[in-house]
């Protein structure tokens, strides 16, 4: 061993089944899952699981994402929804996922709003 060489030590997580690690990671955020994957081989493998990324998606994601959009994995879908908003409800709303928290975000377009005082001369 050369001086200054870093020797990886076994992780206490190495003995856990992958589905157990996947379950633990699914209680975090997409960002935390990516960080975890970068620090441990056991985590890296577990983070690739669709079961992890399915939990980061909103419960109603399948009704929001058009069938014409095909994704190879739930991770790819999650990343896509963080980068590219989807127009929903006939273009009256825009839907995406927050990159940091994974929370569902919806923006209303002016077409989707009714402002009762818009024609009032007072305003």
Curated annotation (Swiss-Prot):
Pfam families: F-box. Transmembrane segments: none annotated. SMART domains: FBOX (SM00256). Residues 10-56 form the F-box domain. InterPro entries: F-box-like_dom_sf (IPR036047), F-box_dom (IPR001810). This is F-box protein PP2-B3.
